[in-house]
Curated annotation (Swiss-Prot):
It is a peripheral membrane protein. Keywords: Membrane, Photosynthesis, Photosystem I, Thylakoid. It is found in: Cellular thylakoid membrane. The keyword Thylakoid applies. NCBIfam families: PRK02749.1 (NF002745). It comes from the Bacteria. Belongs to the PsaE family. Its main location: membrane. GO terms for biological process: photosynthesis. This is Photosystem I reaction center subunit IV. GO terms for cellular component: photosystem I reaction center; plasma membrane-derived thylakoid membrane. The keyword Oxidoreductase does not apply.
């Protein structure tokens, strides 16, 4: 099953900050790049400045590093 925009996915990459977390697929690139799936998360990572709420809440993954938890609703 191909991963599509809007799917809820679990992260299987052990070295990722979001390992075993669930995020939403924001986009899937079809150009053949190594990490084509952009996943958006609710929480941010540790890249913010001290005392700020900043940080990153998206990351790119390969399809093999993701497990679909819930498919996006069909239109």
């Amino acid at each position: 099953m191909a991963i599509a925009r809007g799917d809820k996915v679990r992260i299987l990459r052990p070295e990722s900050y979001w390992f075993n977390e669930v995020g939403t697929v924001a986009s899937v690139d079809q150009s053949g790049i190594k990490y084509p799936v952009v996943v958006r998360f609710e929480k941010v990572n540790y890249n913010g400045f001290s005392g700020s709420d900043g940080g990153v809440n998206t990351n790119n993954f390969a399809e093999a590093e993701l497990q679909v938890v819930a498919a996006a609703a069909k239109k």
